[in-house]
């Protein structure tokens, strides 16, 4: 540890102690908050089922930066490189299309054995795993419908895929000793004016009930459902709307997924957390950065990311909110994208933990909104960066932008050879 870092740390401890904050306790609490990194940043959501196939479901990864992962070994190597540069606890979020098999496997036939390598890798790296059925980029999703499809045969295929995915998820939780959160998102919707908005939702309701009918150990598996305002090709009608899934999660007591890019541009999920928590047992967050639409840009340390983190910390939702990331940018180094976004999420959590929330609550309750605003703004100038640097030091990760040199070296020695 350098003398400069030690001095900055000691000064930061004093400054935060003056406003009633124990920085050591803040770092202990930060280690209670894993962030689930999404596997699909490394290969632009291609997966291993049909890597050359088209990406459908209204999903777009724009850009053509060299070095995308082409197989599971490359993806795991990229993840390891990124994780070495991110301090604190992490998880990995997998989609079903990232299975490994020597022969083609129909999505309704996926089994735990197809993800055995991921589990062994997670054990070796002390990670938890989360999961998602992949209801897109498939011939049976080509017309824009899956679990709400009017064709019984096609709808049953997707029901069976989600059922099989739940068993994979439970396998993750059983093997790793931490529950896997399995999130169901479907692209179902219509491009133009829709006459019958009810029937697809009735079918989706029945389909979801069948999907979750098998009782699984909640210590191993958690069901979550995710809404979306619209998607490309589904601009006029989305079957799985916010109202639909809030009602479903409330009535079935599943987790509800809130994606930062899945609402109107004037809405923010930070404002939805406290409302939804009154009705659902758990929340899954997909922290992203929508630019005019659900563009899934790399997460910044911006106002909304900070507000999301503050909601979790202020209301002590550590055990009820699962923090996941969902962005994919193919225009920049993909490992750097992971590192930037995940470090920013963790920085936001740390800043929230360094807030004098008890004092702010007192001011708010007393109606002293002047002091509340003043204290909130002055808090931004306190030396949280020194606390972050100590956290990185303790987790043997770079504290500042020097991590970029590691990424550049990896790009030169590994990524550049992929073509």
Swiss-Prot record:
One of its GO terms (cellular component) is cytoplasm. Its main location: cytoplasm. Its EC number is 5.3.1.14. InterPro entries: L-rhamnose_isomerase, Rhamnose_isomerase, Xyl_isomerase-like_sf. Keywords: Cytoplasm, Isomerase, Manganese, Metal-binding, Rhamnose metabolism. It is an enzyme of class 5 (isomerase). NCBIfam families: PRK01076.1, rhaA. Belongs to the rhamnose isomerase family. This is L-rhamnose isomerase. The lineage of its organism: Bacteria, Pseudomonadati, Pseudomonadota, Gammaproteobacteria, Enterobacterales.
């Amino acid at each position: 540890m350098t003398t400069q870092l030690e001095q900055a740390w000691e000064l930061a401890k004093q400054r935060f102690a003056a406003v009633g904050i124990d920085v050591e306790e803040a770092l202990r609490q930060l280690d209670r908050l894993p962030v689930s990194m999404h596997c699909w940043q490394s290969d632009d959501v291609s997966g291993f089922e049909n890597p050359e196939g088209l990406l459908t479901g209204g999903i777009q990864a724009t850009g053509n930066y060299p070095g995308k992962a082409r197989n599971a070994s490359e993806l795991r190597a990229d993840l390891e490189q990124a994780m070495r540069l991110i301090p604190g606890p992490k998880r990995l979020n997998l989609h079903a299309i990232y299975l490994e098999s020597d022969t083609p496997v129909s999505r309704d036939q996926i089994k735990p054995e197809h993800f055995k390598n991921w589990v062994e890798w997670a054990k070796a790296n002390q990670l938890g795993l989360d999961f998602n059925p992949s209801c897109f980029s498939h011939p049976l999703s080509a017309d824009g419908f899956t679990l709400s499809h009017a064709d019984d045969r096609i709808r049953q295929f997707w029901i069976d895929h989600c059922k099989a995915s739940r068993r994979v998820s439970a396998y993750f939780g059983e093997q790793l000793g931490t529950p896997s959160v399995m999130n169901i998102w479907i692209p179902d919707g219509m491009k133009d004016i829709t006459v019958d908005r009810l029937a697809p939702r009735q079918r989706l309701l029945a389909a979801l009930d069948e999907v979750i009918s098998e009782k699984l150990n909640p210590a191993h598996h958690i069901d979550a459902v995710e809404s979306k305002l619209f998607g490309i090709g589904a601009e006029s009608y989305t079957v799985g709307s916010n109202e639909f899934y809030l009602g479903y999660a409330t009535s079935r007591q599943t987790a509800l997924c809130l994606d930062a890019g899945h609402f109107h541009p004037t809405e923010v999920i930070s404002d939805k957390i406290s409302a939804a928590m009154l009705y659902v047992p758990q929340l899954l967050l997909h922290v992203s950065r929508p630019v005019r639409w659900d563009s899934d840009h790399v997460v910044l340390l911006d106002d909304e990311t900070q507000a999301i983190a503050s909601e979790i910390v202020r209301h002590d939702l550590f055990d009820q909110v699962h923090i996941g990331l969902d962005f994919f940018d193919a225009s920049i180094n993909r490992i750097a994208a992971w590192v930037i976004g995940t470090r920013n999420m963790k920085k936001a959590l740390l800043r929230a933990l360094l807030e004098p929330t008890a004092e702010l609550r007192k001011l708010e309750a007393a109606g002293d909104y002047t002091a509340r605003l003043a204290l909130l703004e002055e808090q931004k100038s306190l030396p949280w960066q020194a606390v972050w640097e100590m956290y990185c030091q303790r987790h043997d990760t770079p504290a500042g932008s020097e991590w970029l040199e590691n990424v550049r070296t990896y790009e030169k020695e590994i990524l550049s050879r992929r073509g």
